[in-house]
Amino acid sequence: MAKDPVRVLVTGAAGQIGYALVPMIARGVMLGPDQPVILHMLDIAPAAESLNGVKMELVDAAFPLLKGVVATTDVVEACTGVNIAVMVGGFPRKEGMERKDVMSKNVSIYKSQASALEKHAAANCKVLVVANPANTNALILKEFAPSIPERNISCLTRLDHNRALGQISERLNVQVSDVKNVIIWGNHSSTQYPDVNHATVNTPAGEKPVRQLVSDDAWLNGEFISTVQQRGAAIIKARKLSSALSAASAACDHIRDWVLGTPQGTFVSMGVYSDGSYNVPSGLIYSFPVTCANGEWKIVQGLSIDEFSRKKLDLTAEELTEEKNLAHSCLS
């Protein structure tokens, strides 16, 4: 029995991440090899011609799972009937710009997209915010789309999670698929805390803790953390462009695990609405370890938090509270 197509919105679709992401979605990377999709692509008017070029290429690629493409600069048309929304469009910080200026541009973008999604998206639409500042953009979207359940709004920290997996796999010279349960706590920014205290590696002798195998706490508590925190900047320095293919791949991982479930015994990192778990203030979109089943995420409970970690969790929560206040000041 063929499945009904799922409508997936990508905003900022003519941009770098969008260009990497739409073929992955059309190929079944996000929702599986037997799930047909209809792509909705939104971008701003100056990018309309470029967006049309992407649409032409999607047609030319003849993806068997791709059952239709909507390419538009109209936010209502873009949001109508969508089941999944990946919000890549935002206002990037340019040299010499104050944080408040960037924040106020993004607040107005996410405020208007929130109301379009609320009015026109399918019931139970799942929303993933990728554009920076991702946690705070997601929070604004949540506040201006009150009828979208908070459990359906998330932001991308899977890229940081995957970066952490990659660093451990390189350090230990093991397959990245054998490393699991790293955690990204907090903000998708340089205050995020990549935590390996609960991470394990699948070895011929069974699962072993990452800390035990690395046996270099100075590296794990120092260079490892800063490498993951600063990885985005390192890629911009090397490529002269921000990370796109890794961000697109992480967005697919995030949605796939959310919709289809995480493997037994594995948790992943998602920016979700805090309920006070781990003494993180509620009312923030904060990255937690989660498991997913039946299209719902659940924060993993009962993990021990040492003193070193506690400070890191609090520091990134403070930054998110500041960002939230800054965003609210842009609204008033």
Curated annotation (Swiss-Prot):
Active site location: 188 (proton acceptor)
Gene Ontology molecular function: L-malate dehydrogenase (NAD+) activity
Keywords linked to the UniProt accession: Cytoplasm, NAD, Oxidoreductase, Tricarboxylic acid cycle
Subcellular location: Cytoplasm
Keyword NAD: yes
Top-level enzyme category: oxidoreductase
GO annotation, cellular component aspect: cytoplasm
Superkingdom of the organism of origin: Eukaryota
Catalytic reactions on record: (S)-malate + NAD(+) = oxaloacetate + NADH + H(+)
InterPro entries: L-lactate/malate_DH (IPR001557), Lactate/malate_DH_C (IPR022383), Lactate/malate_DH_N (IPR001236), Lactate_DH/Glyco_Ohase_4_C (IPR015955), Malate_DH_AS (IPR001252), Malate_DH_NAD-dep_euk (IPR011274), Malate_DH_type2 (IPR010945), NAD(P)-bd_dom_sf (IPR036291)
Keyword Ligase listed: no
Residues the record lists as binding NAD(+): 16-17, 43, 90, 113, 132
Entry's EC annotation: 1.1.1.37
The family this protein is said to belong to: Belongs to the LDH/MDH superfamily. MDH type 2 family.
Subunit structure: Homodimer.
Name of this chain's protein: Malate dehydrogenase, cytoplasmic
Species the sequence originates in: Medicago sativa (Alfalfa)
